[in-house]
């Protein structure tokens, strides 16, 4: 494989020295970029874009042409795994993702296959291989998956939810069915991420977008337990390099200590967690990624720079920080504001790495 020219991101995740704090943005390939909108229009719809390796590669690379980002992230969707299980994924205009056959009981769970990542999800692996080839070693490629709990919310609710009453009803009234589903998803996600690593992903991230809707006890049993199983089953070395793993639970700031015990290399922080506090609590165990409020990118450039400086000062000197937003970039953010953000991270972080 091509020699990696910029390994700042991988080094920071492993808490090794870097010259400046590395930065990338969740959803950096996305609708805030006019070139993304053009490519998506060419693809026809969102899943067609995900399933076309050349177009998925093109949108993955678009933000790297604009900004000096320190990592690329595979352009895909967290719902590829449930889609490959045959739930009939489709996108409703203005409604987001929906499934034609949601999971309602243990019998439904028993019928679900564990998808073969090189078969039903082969299009994702083709995209990973294509992107790795086209990156030419400029920056590392991040692979990802949704967490079992987060995938289960969509599969049981039949799509997006605000109150999560359907899955919580299953959790409290039929916990065996939900555990069976989460176990099957943990096995599927482990295979899926390992296949991404073999195809060329140099780091992986598990997005637990909806873990924060749970009580502490339920989070441990229904979300963290299954992410821990995945971390235990992941390939941690490939191509002679360690493959770092980041866990991100949105709304999970109160559980960082438990998350750090999973054996992951880094924790993603949303903007509601104070990064100085997070470093005091778990910085001796894991790297931290985050955590500017994505809405800050609506602010004037000087205010964006001020916020970057505040977060850098909060983390302080030393290694183990990957700068990011606290969640995905919003689709109506001015692209030049994202440029201000990336440039500010590199320029203002130098003093913390001398």
Swiss-Prot record:
The record marks 77 as: Transition state stabilizer. Pathway: Porphyrin-containing compound metabolism; protoporphyrin-IX biosynthesis; coproporphyrinogen-III from 5-aminolevulinate: step 4/4. CDD domains: URO-D. Substrate binds at residues 27-31, 46, 77, 154, 209, 327. Pfam families: URO-D. HAMAP family: URO_D. Catalyzes the decarboxylation of four acetate groups of uroporphyrinogen-III to yield coproporphyrinogen-III. Homodimer. PANTHER family: METHYLTETRAHYDROFOLATE:HOMOCYSTEINE METHYLTRANSFERASE RELATED, UROPORPHYRINOGEN DECARBOXYLASE. This is Uroporphyrinogen decarboxylase.
